[in-house]
């Protein structure tokens, strides 16, 4: 019995020594480290330019119109930052009246070579806009739809607002601009 206890004691002691040796070996061959990574995003800046057909700035106070008029208005967007980006614009119709609608009162001649109108209501520039570049015109004229604008619109102010969004193209691969990641919610 004494010999059996001695054998068990020897086996337990051997197991403890093997465990301690293995842990020491693992500690000797492994290490734990800490790294801090700093990620900085670039700033995206753009400018919307509106011109008349003769190249002068579109008047801030707007123009007087009558139904059926075609107004010369050229809208361009400039990349005014140091990063290339994808670009989209949205046209927002407005009127200073609660009773009348501004829906479908404007008809634009979209530049379909450089821009694509998508079902989400945004018009996407078909390529990456590099720093310092300016887009081709989104459109060059606006028609006031005569069938929609009647005498009830006399004295009212109609507005066509151009809103633009951009997301960086660096590290944001996409086959088409509308597939890029990071567009703000509409």
Predicted regions and their residues:
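Short, Lys/Arg-rich N-terminal segment immediately upstream of the first membrane anchor
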Residues: 1-5
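Surface-exposed, hydrophilic segments of mature proteins
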Residues: 18-22, 28-186
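Sec-dependent N-terminal signal peptides of Gram-positive bacterial secreted proteins and lipoproteins
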Residues: 6-25
């Amino acid at each position: 019995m004494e010999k059996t206890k001695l054998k068990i004691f020897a086996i337990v002691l051997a197991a403890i020594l093997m465990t301690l040796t293995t842990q020491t070996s693992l500690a000797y061959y492994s290490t734990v480290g800490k790294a801090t990574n700093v990620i900085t995003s670039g700033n995206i800046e753009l400018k919307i330019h509106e011109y008349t057909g003769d190249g002068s700035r579109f008047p801030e106070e707007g123009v007087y119109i009558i139904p059926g008029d075609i107004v010369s208005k050229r809208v361009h967007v400039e990349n005014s930052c140091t990063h290339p980006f994808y670009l989209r614009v949205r046209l927002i119709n407005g009127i200073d009246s609660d009773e009348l609608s501004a829906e479908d009162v404007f008809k634009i001649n979209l530049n379909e070579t450089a821009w694509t109108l998508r079902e989400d209501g945004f018009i996407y520039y078909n390529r990456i806009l590099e720093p310092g570049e300016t887009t081709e015109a989104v459109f060059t004229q606006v028609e006031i739809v005569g069938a929609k604008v009647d005498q009830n619109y006399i004295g009212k102010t109609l507005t066509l607002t151009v809103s633009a969004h951009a997301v960086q193209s660096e590290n944001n691969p996409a086959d088409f601009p509308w597939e890029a990641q990071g567009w703000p919610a509409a």
